Amino acid sequence: MNAHSKEMAPLMGKRTTAPGGNPVVLTEKRPADLTPTKKSAHFFLEIEGFEPNPTVTKTSPPIFSKPMDSNIRQCLSGNCDDMDSPQSPQDDVTETPSNPNSPSANLAKEEQRQKKKRLKKRIFAAVSEGCVEELRELLQDLQDLCRRRRGLDVPDFLMHKLTASDTGKTCLMKALLNINPNTKEIVRILLAFAEENDILDRFINAEYTEEAYEGQTALNIAIERRQGDITAVLIAAGADVNAHAKGVFFNPKYQHEGFYFGETPLALAACTNQPEIVQLLMENEQTDITSQDSRGNNILHALVTVAEDFKTQNDFVKRMYDMILLRSGNWELETMRNNDGLTPLQLAAKMGKAEILKYILSREIKEKPLRSLSRKFTDWAYGPVSSSLYDLTNVDTTTDNSVLEIIVYNTNIDNRHEMLTLEPLHTLLHTKWKKFAKYMFFLSFCFYFFYNITLTLVSYYRPREDEDLPHPLALTHKMSWLQLLGRMFVLIWATCISVKEGIAIFLLRPSDLQSILSDAWFHFVFFVQAVLVILSVFLYLFAYKEYLACLVLAMALGWANMLYYTRGFQSMGMYSVMIQKVILHDVLKFLFVYILFLLGFGVALASLIEKCSKDKKDCSSYGSFSDAVLELFKLTIGLGDLNIQQNSTYPILFLFLLITYVILTFVLLLNMLIALMGETVENVSKESERIWRLQRARTILEFEKMLPEWLRSRFRMGELCKVADEDFRLCLRINEVKWTEWKTHVSFLNEDPGPIRRTADLNKIQDSSRSNSKTTLYAFDELDEFPETSV
């Protein structure tokens, strides 16, 4: 028997006395008191953005209104003992009565049994509130409970008590989600307890099971909370450094509702700008730097994805990109492709990340052991002039999904004309234009011009109405050999155009029709014109007079299509864009509103006109709906008259409607159209040079696709460079003059320019004419005693 009755009470049941005050009795709430009423529960759910019965559909995007650590959670099953949203730990403390045989003692025993059932809640509450001593006592109680129960699977029981069954969140995750001054000590206690009970590996690598945060571990949370010391402790304790967080919250599809970082802890540290943790993870032998997520993206893909259009974020992304690439020393890391077949370079181009794209294309590493990681190599420098070799791997059209094709053909990129000004893209396109594209463009212009001339002559010297159509192959004075050859040429060329443009239309994407600079509408008008020509020729050969309608439309479209070839001149290239943009944006909107007015007022005015007499002498020009619409159209263009129609039911009302119509259309709508067209022309004029360059780039690639493979290989740009042993790359030489950057020491490859050949554009392009066609990058390095400056 105990000497004092108080010794029978557990430690948690003792009175607590405040310093200098009277003892305070902490009583435990009844289960009924712990259960919120229906009204109060609904009130708290509304605060957190929940609904009583949430309905999730597959089509609607998820709304992440509930954080990873929420203290307000629904209990739909009726059994809330496993929930990780505990009440205050003080609610579990009760005063032990002095008499063990009294009814209050029996009640205390029952309450003790209830506290054991709520042990999980109390552990979660202790770790979230930073109660170190209480956590030690609770873990000791849990360990004692395991010892008293025989035949118990201790590891499973402990994991059950330390893990929330509804989300898979452990008390370790709970502690990391609620950072406080005691968090480090709590983490140490939990890890020591797990190791002592042989559940460390399961405990530290437990993953979220909730759909939103599925796969997230304690290591991910520690990194996200920027806890470097705790991260190091977790890694040393055996945390999985290659775990993948695949929850919906981390899906790039919902990037505006969540955060995509590449799933792995290393990618998370890199995307949140934590270089110390990145270094810590990369020094760990277990870390797989080349790990790819469920979309095939590696860490470099993830960095490209999180880059934005403001300088601060781009700067840290570039630093992280550099750090990871240099520390890994693995060139293949940047050549890995995701599930869409894109490397980090190609992904930057597809997403329109101009700053990151510029950084990758012009990255130059001067240290000799790591020089193979560069994409730019300075061959020689003399004063302000330097000659650089740009790596064309995945840039030129010789590879699938090349950067050049992605930028030119991806109409979803708003700043693609800006990216085409980057090197080596700008010089590469310029070289292609001068080498073969301008000659092909000129030949195409000549053929189409001759085609239109021939079509016009054949149409002009056709049989007139008073002459019968000849037999298709009857060579008489009405159809000479010259006219027959002309028709055959027109038919053959129109057939070629229809086949070529038909294939182009078939390959068009819906987004191409939304862009003025995609040439989609030119493909349509070229195809329609060719089909009209073919149709008119066959109708004529079979003596159908309806051929004339097709022929007239074909001639009009044929000469209008000559506007396509204005892109060969910078001063005229923007006119076709202006016309397309005015028609598709301004005129179509005007016509929609105008037709509404025209139909409405036409019906109203025609309804006011009385029926015409049989002699039709006093018939009004507004007598029918079609006549009224025609007269209103004349008023719009200033050819109609504002006359009072005496044979109308209400002449004054009729005149009032006419005046209102003129004000709304002739005065208001037409002037609005003129103002909108003026604004469109002004906006296009500001971007005229960039628009012209994008037009020309698309034309160059279209002509390049028409070349046979053997001819395309002859026109391949660049020169073969040896970067390292068995590492040869195709590089483009670009000479640059930078008067603002004088170089006292540059990490270049050759000591002088060597013999060079003059080109038409010496300051931009310089072809090497050295005796060896292969440029060896290890040929020369300067002495180390001079201070090195950036190139």
Curated annotation (Swiss-Prot):
Residues 95-105 have a biased composition (Polar residues). The gene is Trpv3. Pfam families: Ank, Ank_2, Ion_trans. It catalyses: Ca(2+)(in) = Ca(2+)(out); Mg(2+)(in) = Mg(2+)(out); Na(+)(in) = Na(+)(out); K(+)(in) = K(+)(out). The keyword Iron does not apply. This is Transient receptor potential cation channel subfamily V member 3. Residues 461-479, 541-545, 609-620, 647-649 are extracellular. It comes from the Eukaryota. Expressed in keratinocytes and hair follicles. Its main location: membrane. The chain crosses the membrane at residues 431-460, 480-508, 520-540, 546-566, 570-608, 650-686. Non-selective calcium permeant cation channel. It is activated by innocuous (warm) temperatures and shows an increased response at noxious temperatures greater than 39 degrees Celsius. Activation exhibits an outward rectification. The channel pore can dilate to provide permeability to larger cations. May associate with TRPV1 and may modulate its activity. Is a negative regulator of hair growth and cycling: TRPV3-coupled signaling suppresses keratinocyte proliferation in hair follicles and induces apoptosis and premature hair follicle regression (catagen). It is a multi-pass membrane protein. ANK repeats lie at residues 117-148, 170-198, 214-243, 261-291, 298-330, 340-362, 398-420. Na(+) binds at G638. InterPro entries: Ankyrin_rpt, Ankyrin_rpt-contain_sf, Ion_trans_dom, TRPV, TrpV1-4.
